[in-house]
Regions:
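Beta-strand-turn-beta hairpins that frame and shape the catalytic cleft
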Residues: 50-58, 164-174, 203-207, 258-264, ...
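Active-site neighborhood of phospho(di)ester-bond hydrolases with catalytic His/Asp-centered motifs
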Residues: 60-62, 79-84, 108-115, 160-161, ...
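Acidic, histidine-bearing metal-coordination/catalytic regions of metal-dependent phosphoesterases
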Residues: 1-60, 64-68, 123, 286, ...
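Active-site-proximal segments of metal-dependent phosphoesterases and phosphodiesterases across multiple
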Residues: 127-139, 181, 203-242
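Internal catalytic-core helix/loop-beta-alpha segment
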Residues: 156-219, 224
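Charged helix-capping and loop-helix junction motifs
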Residues: 94-97, 189-193, 223-234
Length: 292
């Protein structure tokens, strides 16, 4: 997208929006956008690395899918969980997750929903009751009063949904939306529908939490031989918002860290493709914002 006259960047729908693999190839051939020196892989820091003075240590996890029992949680100040903390968003699962959060020693815990948190998506639940009663029987048989305020079960964290919070001077924004995939929660068509959500992200955000990846950063699905990240999310991150950290999950195969030299991109999916919770939490230190 172009720039408006007064300097504010406006993102428009990318011409390759609907085909992320083609978009990746196009931008690589024409701009080397996803190759060194523009981007490179980053090794996670060991857990016993001393935290530098004047820094805050973030611990990133995602896609724990109710399998939190065996996860070794490292030292840190702030926990970031990028969604899919349940299988279906059942209240019993949410309570179990909240209990797990309550036992963790982090000073702050920030959580967003993912496509598996079906009950958190009010539009999804309204449609499910009307149409596809047998697809998720355990969800369909919930009464509205069981799930209407399901996010209030998350008493041990800050829950973000198209909203932000300032913690230790860091502005953190969280959003659950992902490109349509088999009709799960918070799924939207690629293009304008998703861009409308990313346009809600204000400038001046230090840490962006989304459930899924942007195009080209830890979004490769080997068995499909496809990139699946959102092109509009990438353009929003790189051209408009420019956070220090963009943390996500959603694509279990994409676990790991990359940087474009300004933003660090972390896919913190804890579960593997076979839903084993064996990818370790990722620790990331950020210098505290100057209190100007």
């Amino acid at each position: 997208g172009g720039r408006m006259a007064h300097g504010k960047v406006t993102i428009t729908v990318d011409e390759y929006s609907s085909n992320p693999t083609q978009a990746f190839t196009h931008y690589n051939i024409n701009q080397s956008r996803f190759q060194p020196p523009h981007v490179h892989m980053v090794d996670p820091i060991p857990y016993d690395t001393p935290k530098p003075a004047g820094h805050t240590r973030f611990v990133c996890v995602s896609d724990t899918h109710s399998r939190t029992d065996g996860i070794q949680m490292p030292y840190g100040d702030v926990l970031l969980h990028m969604g899919d903390f349940t299988e279906l968003g059942l209240p019993s699962e949410v309570k179990k997750f909240n209990d797990w959060l309550g036992g963790l020693p982090y000073e702050f815990k920030v959580v967003i929903a993912g496509n598996h948190e079906l009950t958190f998506d009010k539009d999804f639940m309204a449609e499910l009751v009307k149409q596809d009663y047998y697809r998720f029987p355990s969800v369909s048989k919930l009464k509205p009063e069981d799930f209407d305020n399901v996010q209030t079960l998350l008493t041990n964290c800050v829950y973000l949904q198209d909203s932000d919070v300032t913690i230790k001077g860091f502005r953190i924004y969280g959003a659950p939306w992902t490109p349509w995939f088999n009709g799960w929660g918070f799924n939207l068509p690629r293009g304008q529908s998703l861009l409308d959500k990313w346009n809600l992200v204000p400038e001046g955000i230090d840490i962006l939490m989304t459930h899924g990846p942007p195009l080209g950063f830890r979004d490769w699905v080997p068995k499909e031989l496809q990139r699946v990240g959102c092109v509009e999310l990438l353009n929003t991150v790189q051209k408009r918002v420019r956070p220090k950290l963009h943390a996500f999950g959603g694509i279990h195969e994409g676990y790991g860290i990359m940087t474009d030299g300004y933003t660090t991109f972390i896919n913190a999916s804890t579960c593997t493709v076979s839903f084993q919770p064996t990818n370790p939490p990722i620790v990331f230190d950020l210098p505290n914002p100057s209190s100007s």
